[in-house]
Amino acid sequence: MNKKILNFIKKKNKTKIISLTAYSKNIASIIDRHCDLVLVGDSLGSVLYSFSSTKKVTLDMMIEHSKSVRMGVKKSLMVVDMPHNTYRNSKEALSNAKKIISKTKCDAIKLEGGKKVIQIIKTLIKNKIPVMGHLGVLPQSATNFKFKGKEIAERKIILRDSKLLEDAGVFSIVLECVESSLAKEITKTVKVPTIGIGASVHCDGQVLVTDDLIGLNKIKARFVKRYSNIEKQINDAALKFKKDVIRSKFPTKKHSY
């Protein structure tokens, strides 16, 4: 395990871990100043391409966006999602993970699931590919996005899977839409950092989709807090530009050759 990953793990129980998503160099270079982890999430499918789910996201999409993000990330740990149907077995997962790592120079990959993907995770880690786990709501296979952990049987499975992921060697676990007390229990139980998204304040850190954070997405999930309204700022700038062009106030001599 490399030094960057080890330093990330050491943050558990010491300081809250900050994570946001990025799909381009420009956004990555801004959030890198404030993040411990920058995630190139397959959420880019819905955020950038208006896909109804992440299932349509391809490996090539992830690689190209990650290459752009890599140019903007200098400080943070950079993690890339393995998209749907790219890790159906150990052989496929290893081939695609190697491709992601070699072409994007990212620090680690993330994949979804518990018991079903344990052998795949072990294979990747055996081949020195750092893996981040993901439990709770799993967008690549979810039929609904209701929070997880309300029922006792479901709680037991998620808790079991968190221990299995830790034993398999993941360096961190994302908990998505997990009931508060369960997220707290998992965070206390496992020795690796938990990163919550809709999983309460009890996790070791938090992650949000940056476009949600800055107010670019129309749909707002319960777990999202908007810290800015970039949509309004873009709208205002475009309107001012339009008015200047119509009134022949742009370009001026200052902006001409």
From Swiss-Prot:
Cofactor(s) listed in the protein's UniProt record: Mg(2+)
Top-tier EC class: transferase
Residues binding 3-methyl-2-oxobutanoate: D42, S43, D81, K110
Binding site for Mg(2+): D42, D81, E112
InterPro entries to which the protein is assigned, alphabetical: Pantoate_hydroxy_MeTrfase, Pyrv/PenolPyrv_kinase-like_dom, Pyrv_kinase-like_dom_sf
Top-level taxon in the UniProt lineage: Bacteria
Family classification: Belongs to the PanB family.
Subunit and interaction comment: Homodecamer; pentamer of dimers.
Protein name in the entry: 3-methyl-2-oxobutanoate hydroxymethyltransferase
Name of the gene: panB
